Amino acid sequence: MKTLQTVHRKLFDQKLAWSQIDKKKALAQPEQLELLREACLVESYLPVYTGKMMALFWDDLNATTIFTIESIEAYGHYYVLRRYLETIGYKPVSDEEVVELRERERGVIYTDRVRELVNFMGTEHFAAQFFLDMSQLLDEPVLAAILPEFAAEEVVHSQFAFDLLQARIRKDPGARSEILEHARNFKHVGAYVRPYVPPAKGDNVRSIRAFNEKFEKLLGQPLSDFLVEEVPDAVR
């Protein structure tokens, strides 16, 4: 499809110096490549996910603008990661694999705006940390150089969701309890279609702490405080 190839070149191909990729360095880190491949698969699902979110928020102009931006930037991440894996010759992602993944949740219709915003906010928060950590773990410099940009985009996406949730609270202070309930049951969007979404580093405490602080800004109290309140006195 020549037109699509032209758009790819214009929007995404210039992001990396493809001819300068050090394949030897890249292939020397198979554990990190597996993580990148998993991230690529999750990103491949997001155009379908954002389509569902557009349907859910069809009458919210700010939200639909936000998910349009998310869809474009998530696709950019997917495209770059997929082409990178193909370029270095490490387990290229196939069209069939992407379609099979997208099919897993094809019949699901989102109905709870708060639940999806909470899950989206958390997903993008952890995705930002993932790409930042990967940029520090990779020895191959070409991809490592672009991943902080991916991380910065994910930070903005998470803030988008925060802003939408904050607007709901301003309109209805009672929304705090609903947000809290979904925060307790947070689910990574990648886990909608994948069995497990691994962090880049085993120690994810810093990112979890920052997630807790995000809820403190939103709800006026850290999420951890609410969770402690639910623990019976006998086990404290």
PLM ranges: what are they?
Residues 1-236:
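Non-heme di-metal
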